[in-house]
Structure formats: structure tokens, C-alpha cells
Amino acid sequence: MGWAGDAGCTPRPPIRPRPASERRVIIVLFLGLLLDLLAFTLLLPLLPGLLERHGREQDPLYGSWQRGVDWFASAIGMPAEKRYNSVLFGGLIGSAFSLLQFFSAPLTGAASDYLGRRPVMMLSLTGLAISYAVWATSRSFKAFLASRVIGGISKGNVNLSTAIVADLGSPPTRSQGMAVIGVAFSLAFTLGPMLGAFLSVEMVPWISLLFAISDMLFIFCFLPETLPQEKRASSVTLGFHTAAHLLSPLALLRFAAVTHSQDPPAEHRLRNLRRLGLVYFLYLFLFSGLEYTLSFLAHQRFQFSSLQQGKMFFFIGLTMATIQGTYARRISPGKEAAAVTRAMLLLVPAFLLIGWAHSLPTLGLGLMLYSFAAAVVVPGLSTMVSSYGSPGQKGTIMGILRSLGALGRALGPVVAASVYWLTGAQVCFTVCSALFLLPFLLLWKLKHPAETSKEE
């Protein structure tokens, strides 16, 4: 599996479903995503300090945002503490970033169905590199926000990575590929903040830019095209016309872009696809909200310092990476629905333990269950969705899924923070834990594509 014979940085021909080629594609995707996500996560431990610096500089744009944050904090009854303010401010910036991904993901997916995965991937990575360059070359809050906007619009590489995995021929490889993408996320969110904590605010954007450029060159040299010309969408106009259906959340939940395509799935498969999309949205809406409020709970109830919170998230990331690298990637094809259903149900006691914990062992047990479930759900759902649609629809379908996830991540933290401060931690975590039963029940009796194919 060495790369010595392919030293030149020339575009690769479309791959055929050969196991060695598929393994190589997955390795390239893993390393490329790891570089990209390390660039993104370096900032996380430094965000509170960065926001405080802009506040001290009395940046006018920062001041207007701060007034909005103060109004929202007052409306939900949040205490006027600097630490809470930083978490809320950073969460709102993160929600805006996710909202931009909600709009851009279906467009990149539809474009890649017509143009191929490689060129659209390179365009996305170029946009990400530009976003870090804008941030690195200016110290103003305006430049920081501009970099987040450019980065949010350009963050199509994750969606494209799932589409590339969906292009691969064998179901076991697709399942392993989705799990490996999850491992890249877990490792990056474990290692990136640790590395960022040792860097200065001035150095981080330059290191992120270095990672982004390295990622761009690496993908250009080693990623083959996985969507052959004969399997692509017949018209870019058709692709963008169907993608326009995704700007409405309701159309997105109906998978309207797939329904109006030239080769729509059978009605029962379309119903399954819509149900999976709803499960994905509800899961990430609830999960991202509770994940966001963990910082509030850890500080309010356990008086965790920033360092202790960093250790908590390191424990979560390490547990997730271990589960994804061992258990999740070995889930047999056709067994994803059962694994995801069990993991979804596990989140109910996990968040009940966290929300009602008054001792560190109880909190640790809740976090362990939470990490196990989180390691399984998204890769499993992604694998299931990747089984739907023709080769020329995979990018659009995975783009829809990423859009639904981005919408959930945009709305979840705002809603969960409001419930947390208006009703308290125990009510917030209890209600949200119970609500996980809704996606669980939606998924419980869903038939896997392999089963429906047998019936046909």
C-alpha cells in the first residue's frame, strides 16, 4: 500500500471497486480530514482569550455583537460571569458557522455530482486556506468574523469526504470509511485543543494556515477521482436546480432534491431516507445542545477550571476515538441500524447521569456512556444513508445529510442554553434525555436498504 510509485502530483484516474484502492482512498481521506480539523480545532482553547482581547481593544463590531450577547444572556437569566459570557459568545459564533454550512453543503454536494469529487474538494480546501489567511494577516474582529464566514461557506470537504466514501463499491468498506471519518474528528478534537493551548493567539492562525495548505497539497497529490464520468449527473443546471430545494428546511427534510431528480428512488426507499434524515437532524439538535451546556454545568456544579474542562473533553475525545477505531469500524454491513438504535437509547441514561451528577464518578460514568454512543451514531447513520441513491446522486444525498446536521448544530446550542438557564441543569438534561426517545423510536423499526432490496 506504499505510495513510492505515485510520487507525482498528477490527477488520478477514476478508481474501480478494488479493495486495495478503496483502502488507500480511506487512508488519504483520514489524513486529509485530520489536517483540516486540526487547523480548525487549534483555536478552541484560545477563543475566550481572543474575545477578551477584542473587548479590551474596544472594537466597534465586537461591541455590537457583545450587546446582542448581553441581551440574550439577560433574556434567559444567565449569570453575568466572564466565563459564561465567553462560552455563550463562542457558541453563537459556532451556530452562525453551522448555519453557513447548512446553506453551502447541498450546493457543494450537487456540484460534485456533476463535476466530480476532486475539483470541488480542491475548491473547498482553497476556500478554507483563504479563510485562515484572512485571519492571519489581520488582527481585527472584523477579519476574524470574515474568516469564519469564508470558512463556513467553504467547509464542504467533510460532506465531500462522506460522498467519496459513498462512492466506494463494497458495503464493508463504506462502513469502515464512515467510522474512520469519525476517528479523524475524535482525534482532531482531542489533539487540536491540546496543541492550541501551547500556542499564542498570534501564532494559531499561521499554524492553521500551514495545516490548510498542507492538506490542499496532500489531497491534490494523492486523492483519486472516485466518481467516473459515466456515473455523474447529466447537467450542472439540474444539480443546482435540485440543490435550490434544500434552502428550505422543510424541503431539505423531504429530500426534495432527490425526489425531483431524473432517477428518484422507489417510494418506500424515499420514505426510509426521509426518516433517516429526520433522525439525524433530531439527534444532532439534541446532542449538540447538551454538549454545549456541558461547559456551563462543569463550571457551575463542579467548579471546573479551563484546564479541567480541557481534560474532560480530552477524555471524551479519546474514548470516542478508541470506540470508533475498534468497535464502530467493525460493525457488519446491514447491522448499522441495530448498533445506532442501541447507541441512541444509551444516550438517555448517559445524559440523565450527567444532568443529575453531584460526584465526579457519576459524571465520569455519564461521560463514558455519552462518548460511546456519540462514537457510533453519526458514522452509523452516515453509512446507512450512503446506501441510498444512484452514483450521480450520492453527493447531493450526503450534502442533504450534512445540511440537516449543520441546521441541528446551529439551533441546538441556542435552544439548550435557553432551557438550561431558564429551568436549570436537571430539568434541561432530563427533558432532552427523554426527547432522545423520539429519534430512537423513528429508527427502531426502520428497515436497512439491504433488507428492502431483498423484498424487491
Swiss-Prot record:
One GO CC term on file: brush border membrane
Family matches, as InterPro entries: MFS (IPR011701), MFS_dom (IPR020846), MFS_trans_sf (IPR036259), Sugar_transporter_CS (IPR005829)
Keyword Ribosomal protein carried by entry: no
Species this chain originates from: Mus musculus (Mouse)
Keywords: Apoptosis, Cell membrane, Glycoprotein, Membrane, Nucleus, Transmembrane, Transmembrane helix, Transport
Segments passing through the bilayer: 25-45, 87-107, 114-136, 179-199, 203-223, 278-298, 311-328, 345-365, 366-386, 403-423, 424-444
GO MF annotations in UniProt: organic anion transmembrane transporter activity
Record family assignment: Belongs to the major facilitator superfamily.
GO biological process, one term: sodium-independent organic anion transport
Subcellular location: Nucleus inner membrane; Cell membrane
Pfam families per record: MFS_1 (PF07690)
Function, as annotated: Probable organic anion transporter which may serve as a transporter for some non-steroidal anti-inflammatory drugs (NSAIDs) as well as other organic anions across the luminal membranes of renal proximal tubules at the final excretion step into the urine.
The name this protein goes by in its record: Major facilitator superfamily domain-containing protein 10
Phylogenetic classification of the source organism: Eukaryota, Metazoa, Chordata, Craniata, Vertebrata
Coiled-coil region(s): none
